[in-house]
């Protein structure tokens, strides 16, 4: 039996948030260094995010994801590798505790659950239905137009001096209230990101082994359902 709340809804609904996160991630990892006692003005951060995203081609990293589903009061911890390539291509390749893949390109989005021999498929435009998100994934979006970005309050840094940022979507009806990120003070890699979706489910991500502009092939973001699997079309 497929656990639809966790597998189908949890991944397909939150993918919009994950996609926005990957866009912001591209910029933060390459921002110049600043002293912990002298954080840059937030406008400088935003401008740099925009510049770096526009010239970033691809990204990959290992991740640990903790997802709490409010309706069943359950927290699952998963591990895998995430890949992103401009424009509009993503792969979340989950390895532990069980394998699954979320593959997205400009045409389709697939959620493949090998153990259940099941594939869910949806038109990618229905995943990326936010106008702001589509603009970003096409390299045309403007951070200041689509997000209000600020340092977290009451503290802009954690006890190690890492930067704490909050990103609020300007779009009405967004699937989340805001994203909160912990950004390393020494190299501006993202250490953690957290968000709650509109249903009260929470996600916490930790990244490692970051590789930028490695020349990822677009073939990585193609998917052919294996023989013998059940395929379900999502509305």
Predicted regions and their residues:
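N-terminal leader/targeting segments and the immediate start of mature chains
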Residues: 2, 29-74, 225-235
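Short beta-strands and strand-coil junctions in structured, solvent-facing domains, enriched
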Residues: 69-71, 98-101, 111, 118-119, ...
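Bacterial N-terminal signal peptides
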Residues: 16-29
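Flexible, surface-exposed loop/linker segments and immediately adjacent secondary-structure boundaries
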Residues: 117-163
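An acidic-aromatic
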Residues: 81-131, 203-204
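N-terminal secretory signal peptides that target proteins for export/translocation
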Residues: 1-13
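Extracytoplasmic
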Residues: 56-58, 77-79, 87, 97, ...
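Gly/Pro-enriched, hydrophobic low-complexity segments
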Residues: 145-235
């Amino acid at each position: 039996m497929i656990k639809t709340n966790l597998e189908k809804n949890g991944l397909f609904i939150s993918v919009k948030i994950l996609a926005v996160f990957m866009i912001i991630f591209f910029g933060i990892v390459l921002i110049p260094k600043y002293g912990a006692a002298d954080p840059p003005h937030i406008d400088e951060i935003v401008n740099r995010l925009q510049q770096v995203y526009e010239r970033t081609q691809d990204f990959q990293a290992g991740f640990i994801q903790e997802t709490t589903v409010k309706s069943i009061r359950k927290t699952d911890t998963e591990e895998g590798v995430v890949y992103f390539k401009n424009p509009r291509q993503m792969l979340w390749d989950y390895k532990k505790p069980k394998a699954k893949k979320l593959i997205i390109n400009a045409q389709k989005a697939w959620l493949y659950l090998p153990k259940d021999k099941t594939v869910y498929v949806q038109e990618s435009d229905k995943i990326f239905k936010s106008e702001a998100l589509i603009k970003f994934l096409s390299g045309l979006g403007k951070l200041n137009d689509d997000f209000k970005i600020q340092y977290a309050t009451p503290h802009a840094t954690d006890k190690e001096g890492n930067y704490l940022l909050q990103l609020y979507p300007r779009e009405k009806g967004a699937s989340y209230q805001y994203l909160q990120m912990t950004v390393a003070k020494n190299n501006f890699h993202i250490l953690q990101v957290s968000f709650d979706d509109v249903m009260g489910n929470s996600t916490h991500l930790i990244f490692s082994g970051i590789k930028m502009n490695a020349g990822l092939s677009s073939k990585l973001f193609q998917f052919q359902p294996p023989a013998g699997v059940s395929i379900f079309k999502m509305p």
